[in-house]
């Protein structure tokens, strides 16, 4: 058993965490050719259906240097091609209610505990405004459109507000008047609420774990990691696909990142947003430097090794962190991305994203859910 002390938590307390020591890891080969061969063998194992162990994933985290990380990315891209194909899932989001959030997530500028500078504050948008943006997203090439709201979630909202029913009605309008698929990210929901969303037409729901179970208490104290897991399980019970990922660059360790990916694998989520922290002024994490581009690529590649068939989605921070190198993520395991603007920050024009995909020989559309692509290719082979 080992003991270490986390930095200050969301509640301002110091937490001593007890963890079992990880198994000893064999360092990856240092010779370039040996590393390339080793990664080819490992990636083929994953393609053949093996699961990467935590020890193996931690070994991948030891790969350093830009050239070696690019070799890791190439191996992850082989897994993506074999398990997911070349269609990149495109979605867009709308912030339907913003600011004054009761939760104290240290990365978020919408929290009432530390309202970020220039963070918008407004109540629930009208169905007409949301529908208009859904239609615009469809024209821009998005296949899914997610309604995102601040707050802990409908599970804790007053029924008298009527907001949940208004969301359900807006979802029905979107399914009736467009061909885009509506998703939601409203926070925690009960099983009954998840079933109501499913009946209204929601097929996928975003509810991120944000970080590993061990690191979560360092960034949020107003609710628990287990609360978020409970909502993911409610969604799956209701027959809604779980779009569940996290944020890289909040001060977490490589082991935290590996643990998050393994938790997502155990939950059997369908889509995994990979957010790259874009530090916002006025938030407790606003002082952090942006994640190194090659650390971001390494994280993406390791997630692909651990989640070979899941939809891995470029999400918030893509442009801000990756800059002109963002196309490398699409050759490192990514097979989905948000297009258009984010919740409180701007994205690049959708036409730029389409041009980037075309230049890489990829096609925007709707990516297969886990297992679907391999089933299709196996049928064709027979």
Swiss-Prot record:
Disulphide bridges: none
A Gene Ontology BP annotation from the UniProt entry: biotin biosynthetic process
Binding of [4Fe-4S] cluster, residues: 101, 105, 108
Catalytic activity: (4R,5S)-dethiobiotin + (sulfur carrier)-SH + 2 reduced [2Fe-2S]-[ferredoxin] + 2 S-adenosyl-L-methionine = (sulfur carrier)-H + biotin + 2 5'-deoxyadenosine + 2 L-methionine + 2 oxidized [2Fe-2S]-[ferredoxin]
EC number(s) recorded for this UniProt protein: 2.8.1.6
Biological pathway: Cofactor biosynthesis; biotin biosynthesis; biotin from 7,8-diaminononanoate: step 2/2
Residues that bind [2Fe-2S] cluster: 146, 183, 243, 313
Cofactor: [4Fe-4S] cluster; [2Fe-2S] cluster
Cofactor note: Binds 1 [4Fe-4S] cluster. The cluster is coordinated with 3 cysteines and an exchangeable S-adenosyl-L-methionine.
Cited InterPro entries: Aldolase_TIM, BATS_dom, Biotin_synth/BioAB, Biotin_synthase, Elp3/MiaA/NifB-like_rSAM, rSAM
Role: Catalyzes the conversion of dethiobiotin (DTB) to biotin by the insertion of a sulfur atom into dethiobiotin via a radical-based mechanism.
Name this protein carries in UniProt: Biotin synthase
Species: Crocosphaera subtropica (strain ATCC 51142 / BH68)
